[in-house]
């Protein structure tokens, strides 16, 4: 079987990641339409992102005390929806990585358990063989002792 050459789990994860983009786009479209999503999910992160981005740019250019105007609602909703979509893709990709890591760890653990079990089996067999060797050695010594204790047979000349 060619399991190692065709890792089905990796192909499945690739499919999930490819499907995450349309899912993220649908969620972004829903976020743009829903007032609750727009006001409480999209706008606050978008305004925070805009504030941090503009503050960083201003400091790099040397302007210190400038006041940063917030984005208008439409631009903030668009930016928030984009941030939400990217976050969803990132979370799905991260989830795939975590699943792949746990799968690899389980495979590694299973292989280690099989190796430990085979080592234990070999040690048990080695112990049994050593015991058998000792028993046979004792029997050979007993036979040799009995042979030496027998009277010598008369020679027929």
UniProtKB/Swiss-Prot annotation:
Pfam family, one: OPA3
Localization (cell): Mitochondrion
Family label: Belongs to the OPA3 family.
Biological role: May play some role in mitochondrial processes.
Record keywords: Coiled coil, Mitochondrion
Name of the protein: Optic atrophy 3 protein homolog
GO terms under cellular component: mitochondrion
Stretches of the chain forming a coiled coil according to its record: 103-129
UniProt-listed InterPro entries: OPA3-like (IPR010754)
Lineage: Eukaryota, Metazoa, Chordata, Craniata, Vertebrata
A single BP term in Gene Ontology: regulation of lipid metabolic process
């Amino acid at each position: 079987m060619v399991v190692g050459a065709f890792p089905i789990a990796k192909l499945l994860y690739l499919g999930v990641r490819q499907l995450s983009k349309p899912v993220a786009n649908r969620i972004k479209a829903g976020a743009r339409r829903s007032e609750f999503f727009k006001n409480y999910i999209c706008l606050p992160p978008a305004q925070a992102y805009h504030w941090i981005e503009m503050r960083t740019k201003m400091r790099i250019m040397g302007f210190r005390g400038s006041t940063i105007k917030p984005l208008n609602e439409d631009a903030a909703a668009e930016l928030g929806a984009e941030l939400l979509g990217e976050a969803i893709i990132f979370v799905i990709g991260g989830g795939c990585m975590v699943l792949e890591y746990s799968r690899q760890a389980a495979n590694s653990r299973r292989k280690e358990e099989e190796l430990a079990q085979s080592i234990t089996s070999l040690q048990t067999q080695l112990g049994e063989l050593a015991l058998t060797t000792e028993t046979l050695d004792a029997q050979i010594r007993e036979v040799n002792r009995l042979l030496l204790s027998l009277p010598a047979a008369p020679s027929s000349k």
